[in-house]
Amino acid sequence: MAEDAVVSDAVVVSDAMSSVAKGAPVTAQRPVRDDLEKHIPKPYLARALVAVDVNNPEGTKGGRHEHGQKSVLQQHVSFFDQNGDGIIYPWETFRGLRRLGFNLIVSFIVAIGIHTGLSYPTLPTWRPSLLFPVYIDRIHKAKHGSDTATFDTEGRFMPVNFENIFSKNARSQPDKLTLREIWMMTNDHRLAYDPFGWVANKGEWILLYMLAKDDEGYLPKEAIRGVYDGSLFEFLAEQRTKKAHGKQH
């Protein structure tokens, strides 16, 4: 009887820790990592200031990127605040996109789309503004659905959800995504009755792929992490500036 109890307890413990249910094949098709605590202290803890992963447990180091006591989501958009006043206007987003290398047409369409969709939720008043500003201190109000949940509802960074992007979707390379994998991932993230989230999520990932894919057509993990805290934008803009200056000389 005692042996039966031990076996029974072992089964219960095993089931309690299982991330796969045989009756739900999708749980096996999209596995989650169970080893994160070997690499990241408390990977389930939302990080307010830094975007951490197994390769960067302290977040972005070196370079010019500083968190400045802004949430990771605020850092994500601050690159586009050209004058540093805490408010992003459509023309600032347009200029930021141009600095990143997008052409005039794409920059115009994306800037209009972003501010049309995200401005109103961030306004400090119920009255809309025809200038369509985005207030950085309220950017968490503009978080849309059907996403990876790497940002929580307050704009903090969730390491466990970031790592699960790759455990669930990276089939060709463990730390990179193909365009097809991105397309399938954004399909899998779609929530019911959330057309805005469907379009926004897919559009953001396709733009990121266009911006940061490598020579082999993969989107690297480090580039994805960098876009979450905005350090990728700063790096790419700086590289383009150096390249332009090099051509002049």
UniProtKB/Swiss-Prot annotation:
- Record domain EF-hand: where: 68-103
Q: At which positions is motif Proline-knot? A: 124-133
Q: Which Gene Ontology cellular component terms are annotated?
A: endoplasmic reticulum; lipid droplet; membrane
Which residues does the record give as heme binding sites? 76
Tell me how temperature affects activity: Optimum temperature is 45 degrees Celsius.
Q: Which Pfam families match?
A: Caleosin (PF05042)
- Asked if Heme is a keyword of the record, the answer is yes
Any known activators or inhibitors? Inhibited by beta-mercaptoethanol and organophosphorothioates such as parathion or terbufos.
Relay the cofactor remark from the entry: Binds 1 heme b (iron(II)-protoporphyrin IX) group.
* pH dependence, record text: Optimum pH is 7.0.
Which locations, inside or outside the cell, does it occupy?
Answer: Microsome membrane; Lipid droplet
Which keywords has UniProt assigned to this entry?
Answer: Calcium, Endoplasmic reticulum, Heme, Iron, Lipid droplet, Membrane, Metal-binding, Microsome, Oxidoreductase
According to the UniProt entry, its GO molecular function terms are: calcium ion binding; monooxygenase activity; plant seed peroxygenase activity
**Reported tissue expression:** Expressed only in developing seeds. Not detected in roots, leaves, glumes and germinating seeds.
Instruction: Please indicate which superkingdom the organism of origin belongs to.
Output: Eukaryota
Task: State the reactions this protein catalyses.
Answer: RH + ROOH = ROH + ROH
Keyword NADP attributed: no
Q: What cofactor does this one take?
A: heme b; Ca(2+)
Which E.C. number(s) belong to this protein? 1.11.2.3
Q: Give the main localization category.
A: membrane
Question: What does the entry's free-text domain comment contain?
Answer: Transmembrane regions are predicted by sequence analysis tools, but these regions probably constitute hydrophobic domains associated to phospholipids.
The subunit field of the Swiss-Prot or TrEMBL record says: Homodimer.
Family listed: Belongs to the caleosin family.
Record function comment: Calcium-binding peroxygenase involved in cutin monomers biosynthesis. Can catalyze epoxidation of fatty acid and sulfoxidation reactions that can proceede competitively, although in favor of the sulfoxidation. Can only use unsaturated fatty acids with double bonds in the cis configuration as substrates. The preferred substrate is oleic acid and is inactive toward ricinoleic acid. Free fatty acid and fatty acid methyl esters are effective substrate forms, but not phospholipids and acyl-CoA. Hydroperoxy-trienoic (HPOT) acids are preferred over Hydroperoxy-dienoic (HPODT) acids as oxygen donors.
What name does this protein carry?
A: Peroxygenase 1
